[in-house]
Swiss-Prot record:
It comes from Ehrlichia ruminantium (strain Welgevonden). Keywords: 2Fe-2S, 4Fe-4S, Biotin biosynthesis, Iron, Iron-sulfur, Metal-binding, S-adenosyl-L-methionine, Transferase. InterPro entries: Aldolase_TIM, BATS_dom, Biotin_synth/BioAB, Biotin_synthase, Elp3/MiaA/NifB-like_rSAM, rSAM. GO terms for biological process: biotin biosynthetic process. This is Biotin synthase. Homodimer. [4Fe-4S] cluster binds at residues 55, 59, 62. The gene is bioB. It catalyses: (4R,5S)-dethiobiotin + (sulfur carrier)-SH + 2 reduced [2Fe-2S]-[ferredoxin] + 2 S-adenosyl-L-methionine = (sulfur carrier)-H + biotin + 2 5'-deoxyadenosine + 2 L-methionine + 2 oxidized [2Fe-2S]-[ferredoxin]. Its EC number is 2.8.1.6. One of its GO terms (molecular function) is iron ion binding. It is an enzyme of class 2 (transferase).
């Protein structure tokens, strides 16, 4: 199995990985993971929604879209003091990276100062900072970099071919343009996708291929399992199988050996055994907290119990004491 860093993957190669016998695939992914990371250490990330609901985009999976009746109450931007308290709590809980997100289409210039203030608060606690704020221009990205932003999250969700089955208010090229702006501003990219949208295995392969063939691999690759939301067009989508989800984790690890592969949304429905296999297959980051934006997340005490049983350490030892 090749362990070099590549940006020239071809679709037949990626499909071949997806079609490997399961044990061979996850073993190869695990061996690559061990070469680039401590396989018994995991990154813990926290996530705060600074603006909830009312998003003008029509992403068919999202509870925050204004296009659907999801019973979600629209909320204004959080005040800085509330955010400051959340950051301090995250620090006490042993979080490594503090991420914040807003339900809007793109960053507005009038909000730059507010966003930069949040970044400064995060950095003052010696935490990594990550923002997920929609489309971003190069000029805006440079301002966020100057403020100290470490990561910017902008998921591509799925393959280019399947994309318009998911969202029509923003193009695939819009997403790639924002990723390019983030990279040019020398901010680390955080970008991944969602499984269970109705996509094929080839779509999953193409999504990972797009990320792996960027000029710089994303430093973080969140892999989400669809959490069906009542009132959205995808509320009745069938659940992706555990095996297929783990396969995708493994292929992501093989294609992007130096990236953090994050278990993101949907983890609350995963057994300890499934999560253990995901970690073996190369996942080495997870979101911690009882809520991810508007959807439930795994129980905090349950996470500590799982990692303790597996002998997996976190970067911050205080995590197990909080």
């Amino acid at each position: 199995m090749c362990t070099s860093i590549r940006h020239d993957w071809q679709l037949p190669e990626v499909l071949e990985l997806f079609n490997l016998p399961f044990n061979d695939l996850i073993l190869n992914a695990h061996l690559i993971h061990r070469k680039f990371f401590n396989s018994n250490e995991i990154q813990i990330a926290g996530l705060l929604n600074i603006k909830t609901g009312g998003c003008p985009e029509n992403c068919k999976y999202c509870s925050q879209s204004a296009h659907y009746k999801t019973q979600l109450k629209k909320e204004d931007l959080l005040n800085i003091e509330t955010i400051k308290e959340a950051i301090k709590k995250a620090k006490v809980n042993g979080i490594d990276r503090f991420c914040f997100a807003a339900a809007w289409r793109q960053i507005r210039d009038r909000d730059i100062e507010y966003i930069c203030n949040i970044i400064s608060l995060i950095k003052s606690e010696n935490l990594e900072s990550c923002a997920s704020l929609g489309m971003v221009t190069l000029e805006q990205a440079k301002k966020l970099k100057t403020a100290g932003l470490d990561f910017y999250n902008h998921n591509i969700d799925t393959s280019r071919d399947f994309y318009y089955n998911v969202t029509t208010t923003r193009s695939y090229d819009d997403r790639l343009s924002s990723l390019n702006n983030i990279s040019e501003a020398e901010i680390n990219i955080c970008s991944g996708g969602i499984l269970g949208l109705g996509e094929s295995i080839e779509d999953r392969a193409k999504m990972l291929l797009t990320l792996a063939n960027l000029k710089k691999h994303p430093k973080s690759v969140p892999i989400n399992r669809l959490v069906p939301i009542k009132g959205t067009p995808f509320e009745n989508n069938p659940k992706i199988s555990n095996i297929d989800f783990i396969r995708t984790i493994a292929v992501a690890r093989i294609l992007m050996p130096e990236s953090y592969v994050r278990l993101a949304a949907g983890r609350e429905s995963m057994s300890h055994e499934m999560q253990a296999l995901c970690l073996f297959a190369g996942a080495n980051s997870l979101f911690y907290g009882e809520k991810l934006l508007t959807t439930p997340n795994a129980d905090c005490n349950d996470d500590k119990n799982l990692l303790s049983k597996l002998g997996v350490k976190t970067k911050q030892a205080v995590f197990f004491d909080s």
